[in-house]
């Protein structure tokens, strides 16, 4: 999945900031066991990215298993200066993001949706580059 993020940014992550939304293994829990965010964040860091992260309930647990991550107070704080935002866990609040606000705070309007919670045409209307999983490109 880190390669998908890199591809959305032209193949290079070194020196770029990636915002990760959702750290727990599923929504409505603080459980980090086998959370997909752990290998994703490790791979992003191995590729040279700086990682900012936010999760509604899993922040304290994530701090004990993730190193060198800037933990943020909300999705918009997380997006500040990011070259891309990645949705890893499908929390309900991530289904109602204010894309105009995100576009203002992000370095580049790139969304990698690993849970397919948005329709590509909806995100394109907001001027974002949108990558999802298992969907044909249009």
Language model segments and positions:
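Structural/interface elements that position substrates and couple domains in central-metabolism enzymes
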Residues: 1-138
């Amino acid at each position: 999945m880190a390669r998908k993020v890199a591809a959305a940014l032209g193949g290079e992550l070194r020196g770029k900031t990636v915002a990760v939304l959702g750290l727990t293994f599923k929504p409505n829990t603080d459980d980090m066991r086998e959370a997909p965010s752990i290998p994703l964040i490790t791979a992003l860091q191995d590729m040279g990215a700086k990682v900012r992260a936010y999760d509604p309930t899993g922040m304290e647990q994530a701090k004990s298993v993730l190193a060198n991550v800037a933990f943020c107070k909300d999705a918009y704080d997380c997006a500040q200066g990011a070259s891309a935002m990645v949705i890893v866990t499908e929390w309900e609040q991530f289904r109602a993001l204010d894309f105009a606000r995100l576009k203002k705070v992000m370095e580049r309007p790139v969304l990698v949706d690993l849970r397919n919670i948005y329709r590509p045409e909806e995100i394109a209307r907001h001027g974002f580059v949108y990558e999802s999983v298992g969907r044909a490109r249009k």
